[in-house]
Swiss-Prot record:
It comes from the Eukaryota. Keywords: Phosphoprotein. PANTHER family: GENE 4779-RELATED, PTHR31866:SF4. The keyword Phosphoprotein applies. Residues 1-154, 208-227, 234-276, 368-480 are annotated as: Disordered. The modification Phosphoserine is found at S43, S84, S120. Residues 50-60, 97-109, 118-135, 414-441 have a biased composition (Polar residues). Residues 139-151, 243-255 have a biased composition (Low complexity). This is Uncharacterized protein CXorf49 homolog. Residues 78-92, 379-395 have a biased composition (Basic and acidic residues). It comes from Rattus norvegicus (Rat). Pfam families: DUF4641 (PF15483).
Amino acid sequence: MGSPEEQSVPGDDFNEESTDPNKNLSLVSGPADSNEGEIRLPSPKGSNLPLVSQQDTSEAPSVVLWTGGCWPDSLVSEEERLGSPEDEKMDGLDFLSQPSVETEQQVANPETPGAKEQPSSESFCAETETGSNRRAPQASGSEEAKAASAATFLPKGLEQSRAWVSPRKSTTSRMLISENVHHPPSEPELSEELNEVQMMRVTICLKDGNHGNQAKNSGPAETGDLARHSNVQTRESFMRMPSSLLTTTRGLTSGMERQTSKELEPFSSKKKQGILWGKGGSKSNYAEAAAGVGALPKAGPRKKMTQKKKPLWDASAVTLGKAFHQWGQRLKSAPAEPATFPPISGVGLPGRSNKCSLLPLRPKQCKNFYTGKRSGAKRTKELQLVAKEDTDSTRDPGSQVQFPTCRAEPPCQSVHQEFSSGDINTRSLQDPGNSQSSGLSQRGILSKKSTPSGDQEEPVGPPAPDSEILQLHGTQGCPRCPELQKEIEDLRKQLSALQAVGEKFQTHST
């Protein structure tokens, strides 16, 4: 900011009737109807500086602004300065904050060496567009891209040749374009250089309510002894440019940041490895080292998680082993239910075989067989059960036992009574696949019973009045008694075999 080349329009002291030679501005415009090829203006050194010729009638005149103690007296007379009242209401320049103005005033001071060497090197040229009433010439002389000034000229009509402006403050953002052009040694070279102006640096200044300046550069600051000649655009073209340039500058900055971040990734990974494994406790000045140190606490929880997972797996294996062990023991110790075994033809259920064992029945049967005693209570119970079974469809009407009338043969009668009143025989008759029930039902010796009696010993009651139905008259003997006795012996053998099989199943199940 302190170099001699950095000069711009002063801010707060700029007015129409300023007497300070270092701060006054003169505005000279070329006539629109001029037929001359060039307009020559005297420079402070005495040489005439030509401007670009305005030969096209469609284009507006070009305005040249000379600054900073170049001319002792203005080229425009006092009469020309006094215009209509409307000229005083025109929009003015946008200026910078006070520090930037002070530095610019110091540079513009004639005592400054840079200003004495090149007093006329700073010039501002505003080219207006055709048909637009608002002209926005802007200038930037700051090298560090921190301060810039924008000027707004609003002549009333295209025919008016001179316009005087007043300063105005605004909060809008301004884009400043600065160029570097050599001081022309001759007149033709200056005109060619003005036509071939190249943009060197773009500076975007944001002005807020506190007159704070924030600048963003799209390129690095360049220093040199070259004079800066800024070509200022009009307001209409100026309003269209900031959005594109803002996006380009932001895109450039974001692209640069991405490239730098991508380039730093492998370097940061190497640094992280070196810091984590080589120098875990030391501090590093690099940002990558800080990132690596910041990543150190993350490794601790992962190791803890892995250590926690191992006991979980061990505990699960132990619990599974215990579960399998208990399951195997439970299989060995748990008694099997009788319902789980498939039904076997000719074999009664184990739970019921205990109640109807043949061991206590044999002495009773033998006792009844040899003594000839018969129990009236059992006979009455048998007859009552036969009378109550009306729902049994398989009961034969002629299946009632026909006993012989001769009472001299008690063994035959006792055998018939044992088979008719025994629980074992009634259960064997209930099984559909039992061969015993099929043989007995074909011969018609025993009556079929669907519901077994609970106990063999029944309470003694009065005999039924219809007990004499079993004794049929007209029969003198029992020719089938020997056959029945053989069948009884065969059935007992079969029952004993079935009972042994049932006992084996019970022992295996327990």
